[in-house]
Amino acid sequence: MDLKAQSIPFAWLDRDKVQRLTNFLSNLENLENVDLREHPYVTNSCVVREGEDVDELKTLYNTFILWLMYHYVLSKRKPDYNAIWQDITKLQNVVNEYLKSKGLNKGNFENMFTNKEKFESQFSDIHRALLRLGNSIRWGSNVPIDTPYVNLTAEDSSEIENNLQDAEKNMLWYTVYNINDPWDENGYLVTSINKLVYLGKLFVTLNQSWSKLEKVAMSQIVTTQNHLSGHLRKNENFNAVYSQRVLQTPLTGQRVESFLKIITSDYEIIKSSLESYSASKAFSVPENGPHSLMDFASLDGRMPSDLSLPSISIDTKRPSADLARLKISQPKSLDAPLKTQRRHKFPESDSVDNAGGKILIKKETLGGRDVRATTPVSSVSLMSGVEPLSSLTSTNLDLRDKSHGNYRIGPSGILDFGVKLPAEAQSNTGDVDLLQDKTSIRSPSSGITDVVNGLANLNLRQNKSDVSRPWSKNTAANADVFDPVHRLVSEQTGTPFVLNNSDVAGSEAKLTTHSTETGVSPHNVSLIKDLRDKDGFRKQKKLDLLGSWTKEKNDKAIVHSREVTGDSGDATETVTARDSPVLRKTKHANDIFAGLNKKYARDVSRGGKGNSRDLYSGGNAEKKETSGKFNVDKEMTQNEQEPLPNLMEAARNAGEEQYVQAGLGQRVNKILAEFTNLISLGEKGIQDILHNQSGTELKLPTENKLGRESEEANVERILEVSDPQNLFKNFKLQNDLDSVQSPFRLPNADLSRDLDSVSFKDALDVKLPGNGEREIDLALQKVKAGERETSDFKVGQDETLIPTQLMKVETPEEKDDVIEKMVLRIRQDGETDEETVPGPGVAESLGIAAKDKSVIAS
């Protein structure tokens, strides 16, 4: 690794500091002391300041890089000390020879110099033994003398000691002190012992000092590495996770160099992760931690693109919150205000994108549980249950105008799209400003978008009064019985649809007079109260319901009728299922959403679930009409079914008489019924199934001679229209096939023909234009293998191989005879034997593939 300023991965430092750090590392062996701890100005160059404050994380990173580079240079510049060891072994041999001559060598002294590690570990014993031996040689006695060397002056001893200290401070660049005896006072043997002692001390000092600094550097590297990875563990973006994995790499002295290369290559990723952490540490992290992205799911099944989600509660003390965009609702009554609480986990939640913000709606709304949802744009709180009219003044409604119309929230808490409230009905809402928020939003594109966005913008305060669960036994069959104009009639398909008297021509419902205050006549209100106590509206067991469906499945048609009682008297009218305007709306909706009705296609076509076959049988329908009228109340008693509670039906069926008096039940039921019919999956009739691709409808015979429907005739008519023979009548390939090379080497067989009118037989026939002279010449050229003549072929004037028989003929007729004979011989004997003709066979050379037993050459 090159020690240049641009190659060392320091970050957030100015040029002077980087140059100072680079110079220190480049000139490390020239310093008096190579210990990094002895150079505080170098470590201070790693400090990164943000104004007057020190960025601890960035400073820690630069310190980490500095210690990595220090360890790298310390390892690369370390000498091997082999020269010192060679001198030690030479001097050891001199001493060993003397011991052998005196008979004192027993092998112990020699074994101490076998390897460097053993010498370094046993050097203290070697030192004492050498001093005792030198003193005995120099002074003639074995008396120990407390001197580091044998018969050296104090000045020499001091210089040697200084030399060892310098080697300890800088083991990368050292000098060897020369011990000599100019006046031969000690002799060669004693001088050799003094040199051996000094070199032994120098060798041990160099090794131990380097090992000490290497351990210090590794300790600093590991400590700084753990601190950095610990900081990045709190961040969850990709760069932080990747950098954390890199910093968690186990390091040893041998792996520092490779780790430095990884840091250098991933410098930008690690730098950006540290910058993002430094920028985010100024914001406080909540005690329960940030919400995980996987705890939330959007309505469309896609995850949000951003990695951070809005907080569940709004903290006005946080500097990052935009107070101008927050809308805090104030209660207008003595009811306790709703307090938004932080939830640590939302196991199931929906995310609705509304005007640039996220509205989190919990899915337990349907079960009557408490639901809280907030958004950064506006404080939204959707509560289960509907407040009565008396407490409506404490409700804060958040409504928005649309460019194509206004939609409001009536007293029942249900959206009324595209319908403007009359002045009389709007005056009954008390002190509530229905147009409190006039912020324009983007217009929805469909009915389902209107409902979803409208429900998301509800801002209803929780009511202390308990509202009973819709479809409970202490409530009427459903809330639709309170509306004298719209009534939900249950079809046998299980999907309710609206039977509206206002859609029937000549209906007497149009003559019903309504009060200007409530929209409902007082007489009808009293009748509605009486209807609640009737036995006909009480629920029947599900077993009886299934029994009644089975009994009427095959021999009765469904005829939807109702009995309407007005102020002038009782009037009864019948609307058949075939002529019902709702079925026309349903059919139109099914044409739009044709792909949504696959679920019940099998049941409808076979007369299964829903008994739709009887629905379109004219004979049974007319028989049902003549049998008499029946009251829809009794039909609801017999065919009672209990739909699954959902958000729309719970709000629709939770109405009380005060909502009817407000005059909004009609509009509400109409809008919700149209939406229900729009998304229904069970009302696709047989006419929609038989709807062909051209857009015309099949006219099926409804009666035969016996007055009953002829199912066989209908089936034949269906099969006749969808005749499989005519299915590919006009089928033709748009693009002609390109000419291909036949594997049998057909001579220019033209295969680029239409497949619908021409077979492959004509394309495979062999046709030689004229007398075939050109084709024969081309074929004979292919047989030219090895430039040799054979018994069957000879070289012509144009250097082409020509059959011998053709060399003797002159007229075209004779050539044709020769060719015919050759082909017959090929057919009888198979391909020409390889011994006779080398290379490709005659059939291949001629390019002819015979069919059957003869070949026609034209």
UniProtKB/Swiss-Prot annotation:
Keyword Ribosomal protein: no
Listed transmembrane segments: none
Encoding gene, per UniProt annotation: U11
Keywords: Phosphoprotein, Virion, Virion tegument
Family: Belongs to the herpesviridae large structural phosphoprotein family.
Matches recorded under InterPro entries: Herpes_UL11/UL32
Main localisation: virion
This protein's name: Large structural phosphoprotein
Region: Disordered, residue numbers: 603-629
Entry PTM: Phosphorylated at multiple sites.
GO molecular function: structural molecule activity
Cross-referenced Pfam families: Herpes_UL32
Subcellular location as annotated: Virion tegument
Native species: Human herpesvirus 6B (strain Z29)
Subunit (UniProt): Homotetramer. Interacts with the major capsid protein. 180 tegument protein pU11 tetramers bind to the virion capsid.
Gene Ontology terms: cellular component: viral tegument
